[in-house]
Amino acid sequence: HLLTCGYNDAVTEGKIKDIPYMLGSTADDIGVFPEMKEKGEHGGIYKGCINWSLALEKLGRKPAYVYYFTRALLGDDAGAFHSSELWYMFGTLGRSWRPKTEGDYALSKEMMDDWTNFMKTGNPNAEGKDDWKPCTKDDPYVQVLDVRK
Protein backbone atom coordinates (compact mmCIF):
# COMPACT_ATOMS: atom_id res chain seq x y z
CA HIS A 1 0.00 0.00 0.00
CA LEU A 2 1.21 3.46 -0.83
CA LEU A 3 -0.74 5.20 1.93
CA THR A 4 -0.47 3.50 5.28
CA CYS A 5 -2.66 5.93 7.25
CA GLY A 6 -5.14 8.75 6.76
CA TYR A 7 -4.15 12.32 5.99
CA ASN A 8 -5.01 13.71 9.44
CA ASP A 9 -3.09 10.93 11.17
CA ALA A 10 -0.08 11.50 8.92
CA VAL A 11 0.05 15.18 9.87
CA THR A 12 -0.58 14.80 13.60
CA GLU A 13 1.79 11.83 13.94
CA GLY A 14 4.55 13.61 12.04
CA LYS A 15 4.60 11.07 9.21
CA ILE A 16 4.96 13.68 6.49
CA LYS A 17 8.19 15.12 5.18
CA ASP A 18 9.63 18.14 6.99
CA ILE A 19 9.77 20.37 3.95
CA PRO A 20 8.29 23.79 3.18
CA TYR A 21 4.82 23.59 1.65
CA MET A 22 2.88 25.87 -0.67
CA LEU A 23 -0.83 25.25 -0.78
CA GLY A 24 -3.97 27.15 -1.59
CA SER A 25 -7.37 27.34 -3.11
CA THR A 26 -9.44 29.38 -5.51
CA ALA A 27 -12.28 31.71 -4.56
CA ASP A 28 -14.86 29.58 -6.37
CA ASP A 29 -13.32 26.15 -5.84
CA ILE A 30 -16.70 24.48 -5.56
CA GLY A 31 -18.59 26.81 -7.90
CA VAL A 32 -19.96 23.83 -9.79
CA PHE A 33 -21.80 22.78 -6.62
CA PRO A 34 -24.17 25.67 -5.89
CA GLU A 35 -25.91 23.69 -3.13
CA MET A 36 -22.63 23.64 -1.16
CA LYS A 37 -22.21 27.37 -1.67
CA GLU A 38 -25.73 27.99 -0.38
CA LYS A 39 -24.94 26.01 2.78
CA GLY A 40 -21.83 28.13 3.36
CA GLU A 41 -19.46 25.21 2.76
CA HIS A 42 -17.46 27.01 0.07
CA GLY A 43 -14.77 28.18 2.49
CA GLY A 44 -13.79 24.69 3.58
CA ILE A 45 -10.85 24.29 1.23
CA TYR A 46 -9.53 27.76 2.09
CA LYS A 47 -9.84 27.12 5.83
CA GLY A 48 -8.35 23.66 5.41
CA CYS A 49 -5.19 25.14 3.89
CA ILE A 50 -4.78 27.49 6.83
CA ASN A 51 -5.48 24.74 9.37
CA TRP A 52 -2.95 22.45 7.69
CA SER A 53 -0.22 25.10 7.81
CA LEU A 54 -0.99 25.75 11.50
CA ALA A 55 -0.78 22.01 12.23
CA LEU A 56 2.66 21.93 10.61
CA GLU A 57 3.78 24.88 12.72
CA LYS A 58 2.49 23.20 15.89
CA LEU A 59 4.65 20.17 15.05
CA GLY A 60 7.69 22.46 14.65
CA ARG A 61 7.88 21.85 10.92
CA LYS A 62 9.20 24.05 8.14
CA PRO A 63 6.86 26.84 7.03
CA ALA A 64 3.81 26.61 4.82
CA TYR A 65 2.91 29.37 2.39
CA VAL A 66 -0.81 29.68 1.64
CA TYR A 67 -2.41 31.34 -1.38
CA TYR A 68 -5.95 32.31 -2.32
CA PHE A 69 -6.49 32.77 -6.06
CA THR A 70 -9.34 35.24 -6.59
CA ARG A 71 -9.02 36.19 -10.26
CA ALA A 72 -12.47 35.72 -11.80
CA LEU A 73 -11.60 34.63 -15.32
CA LEU A 74 -13.22 36.57 -18.12
CA GLY A 75 -15.55 34.97 -20.64
CA ASP A 76 -18.37 33.65 -18.47
CA ASP A 77 -19.47 33.74 -14.84
CA ALA A 78 -17.51 30.74 -13.51
CA GLY A 79 -15.33 32.99 -11.35
CA ALA A 80 -12.04 31.69 -9.95
CA PHE A 81 -12.99 28.04 -10.40
CA HIS A 82 -11.06 24.96 -9.28
CA SER A 83 -7.72 24.72 -11.15
CA SER A 84 -8.10 28.12 -12.85
CA GLU A 85 -4.81 29.23 -11.28
CA LEU A 86 -2.88 26.59 -13.21
CA TRP A 87 -2.86 28.58 -16.48
CA TYR A 88 -1.21 31.43 -14.57
CA MET A 89 1.15 29.25 -12.54
CA PHE A 90 2.52 27.46 -15.61
CA GLY A 91 2.42 30.42 -18.02
CA THR A 92 -0.09 28.75 -20.32
CA LEU A 93 -2.71 31.49 -20.59
CA GLY A 94 -2.56 31.15 -24.38
CA ARG A 95 -4.08 27.66 -24.11
CA SER A 96 -7.30 29.07 -22.66
CA TRP A 97 -10.05 30.42 -24.89
CA ARG A 98 -10.85 33.13 -22.36
CA PRO A 99 -10.07 36.80 -22.98
CA LYS A 100 -6.98 38.08 -21.14
CA THR A 101 -5.74 41.48 -20.08
CA GLU A 102 -2.25 42.84 -19.50
CA GLY A 103 -3.00 42.29 -15.82
CA ASP A 104 -3.53 38.58 -16.43
CA TYR A 105 -0.10 38.27 -18.04
CA ALA A 106 1.51 40.27 -15.23
CA LEU A 107 -0.16 38.01 -12.64
CA SER A 108 1.04 34.93 -14.51
CA LYS A 109 4.63 36.25 -14.55
CA GLU A 110 4.47 37.00 -10.83
CA MET A 111 3.10 33.55 -10.04
CA MET A 112 5.69 31.78 -12.22
CA ASP A 113 8.43 33.71 -10.42
CA ASP A 114 6.97 32.87 -7.00
CA TRP A 115 6.61 29.14 -7.77
CA THR A 116 10.10 29.00 -9.31
CA ASN A 117 11.62 30.67 -6.24
CA PHE A 118 9.73 28.28 -3.99
CA MET A 119 11.01 25.24 -5.89
CA LYS A 120 14.58 26.55 -5.73
CA THR A 121 14.67 27.78 -2.13
CA GLY A 122 11.54 26.71 -0.23
CA ASN A 123 10.47 30.37 -0.13
CA PRO A 124 8.33 32.02 -2.84
CA ASN A 125 9.95 35.43 -2.38
CA ALA A 126 12.69 36.53 -4.74
CA GLU A 127 15.87 37.90 -3.20
CA GLY A 128 15.13 41.25 -1.57
CA LYS A 129 11.36 40.61 -1.62
CA ASP A 130 9.43 39.50 1.44
CA ASP A 131 5.76 40.19 0.81
CA TRP A 132 4.68 36.51 0.94
CA LYS A 133 4.96 35.44 4.57
CA PRO A 134 4.46 31.95 5.97
CA CYS A 135 1.05 31.23 7.47
CA THR A 136 1.52 30.97 11.25
CA LYS A 137 -0.59 31.07 14.40
CA ASP A 138 0.65 34.58 15.19
CA ASP A 139 0.13 35.75 11.61
CA PRO A 140 -2.19 33.49 9.57
CA TYR A 141 -1.08 35.22 6.38
CA VAL A 142 -2.60 34.23 3.05
CA GLN A 143 -1.25 35.64 -0.22
CA VAL A 144 -4.16 36.82 -2.37
CA LEU A 145 -3.45 36.30 -6.06
CA ASP A 146 -5.40 38.52 -8.47
CA VAL A 147 -4.75 41.11 -11.14
CA ARG A 148 -3.78 44.52 -9.84
CA LYS A 149 -6.53 47.09 -10.24
Each PLM stretch: what is its role?
Residues 2:
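GGW-centered surface loops in extracellular recognition modules
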Residues 5-149:
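C-terminal helix-and-tail extensions that cap enzymatic domains
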